[in-house]
Amino acid sequence: MAVPARRTSKTKKRMRRGHIKLNVPNLQFDAATGEYRISHHVSPKGYYKGAQVVKKSDDNANA
């Protein structure tokens, strides 16, 4: 059975676990829509760098 030869110190344990963390998304305030969006991504309303680049289609009109 595999058993550690020596006890792992607090420093070694913490160094190993140093990269285990949650990543916070980089949010930017979009002045065109007044909402927050992820950097370098189109906002949910279709705006990028203050200009509308994607026109939202109205799915309810076809129903």
From Swiss-Prot:
GO biological process: translation
UniProt keyword Ribosomal protein present: yes
Pfam families per the UniProt record, alphabetical: Ribosomal_L32p
Alphabetized UniProt keyword annotations: Ribonucleoprotein, Ribosomal protein
S-S bridge residues: none
CC annotations in GO: large ribosomal subunit
InterPro entries in UniProt: Ribosomal_bL32, Ribosomal_bL32_bact, Ribosomal_zn-bd
One GO MF term: structural constituent of ribosome
Entries under NCBIfam families matching the protein: rpmF_bact (TIGR01031)
HAMAP family per the UniProt record, alphabetical: Ribosomal_bL32 (MF_00340)
Protein name: Large ribosomal subunit protein bL32
